[in-house]
Design a protein with these regions (language model features):
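Glycine-rich phosphate-binding loop plus the immediately following alpha-helix
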Residues: 101-124
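N-terminal glycine/serine-rich phosphate-binding loop of ATP-dependent small-molecule kinases
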Residues: 1-96, 106-107, 111
Length: 124
């Protein structure tokens, strides 16, 4: 049988679920994830810990399902909404991920709308 893996990096937890060919949930595993608040209005996530959480929940879900990773034919990934996750040329995170609840950049879209940048970027 072929299996499918869903991976969800939500705002408060990371979850992995294994489904069979009929769409039946075979196994699920999850864990809470920490939000970093280095300053008021800043919300971030440690990218290395996020990677470790993903690996852990995938490992647990596959183990609970009683299958091997080779039996998974497709992986679907979703997340918490908007955010910024920067990777360097060395395939390492440049900095902590910035979460959608972070307020430090709220003024940029307002400024871009006023000065015409938004219109230029989305010209058809």
């Amino acid at each position: 049988m072929r299996y499918y893996l869903g991976l969800d990096n939500g705002g408060t937890s990371t979850k992995a679920a294994v489904f069979d060919e009929t769409g039946r949930e075979v196994a699920v595993a999850g864990m809470d994830t920490a939000m970093l608040v280095p300053k008021p209005g800043f919300t971030e996530r440690d990218m290395d810990k996020m990677w470790e959480a993903n690996c852990e929940v995938i490992r647990k879900a596959v183990e609970k399902a009683g299958i091997t990773g080779e039996e998974i034919v497709c992986v679907a990934v979703c997340g918490h909404g908007k955010g910024l996750y920067l990777w360097g040329k060395d395939d390492r995170p440049v900095r902590n991920g910035i979460i959608s609840t972070d307020n430090r950049a709220w003024s940029y879209p307002v400024k871009w709308k006023k000065n015409g940048t938004e219109e230029k970027v989305f010209e058809r």
